[in-house]
Regions:
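PLP-dependent enzyme catalytic core of the Aspartate aminotransferase-like
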Residues: 161-162, 344-353, 358-394
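Conserved core segment of the aminotransferase class I/II
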Residues: 225, 229-300, 307-309, 313, ...
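Conserved PLP-anchoring active-site segment centered on the Schiff-base-forming lysine
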Residues: 112-134
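Conserved glycine-rich beta-strand-loop-beta hairpin in the small C-terminal domain of fold type I
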Residues: 282, 298-307, 317-330
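Active-site phosphate-binding strand-loop segment of PLP-dependent enzymes
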Residues: 142, 146-215
């Protein structure tokens, strides 16, 4: 604007530009490349759940503002899911809150629980909205880096303990972990739980990939560990489990006090969202366990296809224990800069990926790592692998 010298964007958000996902998806569209960057499936979820959404629309359920905490049918289904899967009992009226996807749940939790100047310990690399939401809350993020070890990315518990200070308010967890695919073990989570109780910390845990774990990995909600239910906000989502990312239906489960606090922030964000889809997700959560087992087996096969193809193309591959992302090391290809590599990859191979460095405060830690998504059709993954194998011949 003419004559204005003060920056329009406030200083809390000044470090955040357009997300890398928007940039790389636009690059995929412009070049006609296969988009293995952003984590969304290229097929829809179960037909019966789509039909449930259609019925809700036609019957006028959710077409007007739904209740602020979410429709009772969905809150009840979420509580039933937590009890059936993990033995966690939540009151659907006081301890469950429906949100506009997990991203709003993260934002509302941090805005509600973090005071300006509070420190938030987060595992890096991290989903990019974590940093922005901490900044919007006026908090200070304190990253603890997951580092490559024995083919995976490992948490150093001593480093985590050292990161906690008198100013620490909460630990922000993500397991299964995006982008590395690490699934925190029961022993690791027990150590984190002991630290949280010893230092009187809250835990906000993003568990949207809870059903996407492979081989012998086990997803353990930290809220299920002794002494943790009363200090944990657990975040879940329908998008990843049921392949309806556009519906934006997420939720939190927590004590009445924590749920009320998060709702106080959430009501001034979207207030409500996704009315008809809430009824459909309630039905999805009641699908037989055979659905999630089938999804897990399907994704594990896709993980193996992409991982083996990337290894054959010359990448160093960190095979994930969970999520639907593979992190690769580009140094065996003679590359060291993930940003430059990913920006050139569409022209070189017709494939789009994400540079992991965007998920780090310590950018140098993530510089040689690149993330690929395998939540695509098998034929798409095979074509991507065939294209990537040409890299060594270009």
């Amino acid at each position: 604007m003419a004559g204005m010298t003060r920056p329009l964007l406030n200083r809390r958000l000044a470090e955040f530009g357009t997300t890398i996902f928007a940039e790389m998806s636009a690059l995929a569209a412009r070049t006609g490349s296969i988009n293995l960057g952003q984590g969304f499936p290229d097929t829809d979820g179960p037909e019966e759940i789509r039909e449930a959404a259609v019925r809700a629309l036609r019957e006028g359920r959710g077409n007007q503002y739904p209740p602020g905490p979410g429709v009772p049918e969905l809150r009840t289904a979420i509580a039933e899911h937590q009890l059936r899967r993990y033995g966690l009992a939540y009151d659907p009226d006081a301890e469950v809150l429906v949100t506009a996807g997990a991203t709003e749940a993260i934002a509302a939790a941090l805005l509600a629980l973090v005071e300006p100047g509070d420190e938030v310990v987060a595992l890096e690399p991290y989903y990019d909205s974590y940093a922005a939401c901490i900044a919007m809350a006026g908090g200070t993020r304190v990253p603890v880096t997951l580092r490559p070890h024995a083919g995976a990315f490992a948490l150093d518990l001593d480093e985590l303990k050292a990161a906690v200070t008198e100013r620490t308010r909460l630990i922000l967890l993500n397991t299964p972990h995006n982008p590395t695919g690490t699934v925190l073990s029961r022993a690791e989570l027990t150590a984190i739980a002991e630290l949280a109780q010893e230092r009187d910390l809250l835990v906000v845990t993003d568990e949207v990939y809870e059903h996407l774990v492979f081989d012998d990995a086990e997803h353990v909600p930290i809220a299920s560990l002794p002494g943790m239910r009363e200090r944990t906000v657990t975040i879940g989502s329908a998008g990843k489990t049921y392949s309806f990312t556009g519906w934006k239906v997420g939720w939190i489960t927590a004590t009445p006090e924590l749920t009320s606090a998060v709702r106080s922030a959430k009501q001034f964000l979207t207030y409500v969202a996704s009315g008809p889809f809430q009824y459909a997700v309630a039905e999805a959560l009641r699908l037989p366990d055979a659905y999630t087992e089938g999804l897990r087996a399907e994704l594990q096969a896709k993980r193996d296809l992409l991982s083996e193809g990337l290894a054959a193309a010359g990448f160093g591959v960190h095979r994930p224990a969970g999520t639907y992302f593979v992190t690769t090391d580009i140094r065996p290809l003679g590359e060291t800069d993930g940003f430059a590599f990913c920006r050139a990859l569409p022209e070189r191979a017709g494939v789009v990926a994400i540079p992991n460095a965007v998920f780090y405060d310590h950018r140098e830690e993530g510089a040689p790592f690149v993330r690929f998504a395998f939540c695509k059709r098998v034929d798409v993954l095979q074509e991507a692998v065939d294209r990537l194998k040409r890299l060594g011949r270009v």
